[in-house]
């Protein structure tokens, strides 16, 4: 081994942080999205004030309510009808909502399964709603002939947990229910507030850029033996 190789090896050993758990955000980290397409789709339905309720990271009003699971889809459709002043077929609302989503590249689906084979525990922690997540289960996670639970050990979804990021309580509940130690856990998220909240609890974090290929990151976080 040359001196340069030895120095690189020492530097890698110092920098590497073994972890047991990897937690992925969904939108912007695994699945790409098109916010403008979603806004335009709702405007075509007559929902002209949609941009008051929807953004890439946190929602407001009744869009926040369906994301934190405090209203049912049926109640949510009725709220939209009242907002626009006329009835809209729920299927058309679903289509407009899910137009926000694009796809997960195959290499990222392969990455998730490979991480599990290497010995990591792989989780999802996402602010999402039942309509969008059911669409993803059918149209994204099944495209390789598998199911979503072939890619993750466990799912932590805001609408099921009745709480959303970046609130501290959702991270604490994830750690407790997933039996995770913060210092053995890496969160990959594209929201600065989410990363800051997780870091404050001692979780290792990585702020991902939209549609980033971050596979090389795991050299720095090898699986804990």
Describe every region a protein language model picked out.
Residues 25-28, 69, 124, 155, ...:
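Generic structural signal for small/hydrophobic residues in well-ordered secondary structure
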Residues 62-66, 112, 152:
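Generic hydrophobic alpha-helical segments
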Residues 17-106, 117-118, 129-132, 220:
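N-terminal helical cap/lid subdomain that shapes the substrate entry/recognition surface
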Residues 116-117, 199:
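Anion (oxyanion) recognition and catalysis
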Residues 39, 109-113, 124, 171, ...:
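Short amphipathic alpha-helical segments and helix-helix/interface helices
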């Amino acid at each position: 081994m040359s001196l340069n190789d030895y120095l690189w090896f020492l530097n890698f050993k110092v920098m590497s942080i073994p972890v047991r758990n990897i937690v992925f955000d969904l939108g912007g980290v695994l699945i790409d999205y098109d916010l403008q397409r979603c806004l335009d789709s709702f405007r075509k339905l007559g929902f002209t004030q949609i941009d008051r309720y929807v953004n890439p990271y946190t929602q407001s009003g009744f869009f926040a309510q369906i994301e934190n699971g405090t209203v049912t889809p049926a109640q949510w459709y009725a709220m939209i009808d009242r907002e626009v002043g006329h009835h809209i077929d729920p299927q058309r609302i679903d289509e407009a909502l899910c137009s926000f989503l694009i796809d997960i590249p195959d290499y990222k689906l392969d990455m998730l399964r490979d991480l599990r084979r290497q010995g990591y525990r792989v989780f999802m922690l996402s602010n999402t709603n039942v309509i969008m997540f059911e669409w993803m289960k059918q149209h994204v996670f099944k495209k390789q002939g598998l199911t979503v639970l072939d890619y993750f050990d466990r799912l932590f979804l805001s609408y099921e947990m009745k709480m959303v990021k970046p609130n501290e309580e959702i991270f604490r509940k994830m750690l407790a229910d997933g039996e995770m130690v913060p210092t053995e856990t890496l969160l990959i998220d594209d929201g600065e507030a989410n990363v800051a909240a997780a870091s404050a609890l001692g979780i290792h974090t990585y702020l991902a850029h939209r549609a980033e290929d971050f596979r090389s990151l795991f050299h720095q976080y090898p699986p804990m033996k």
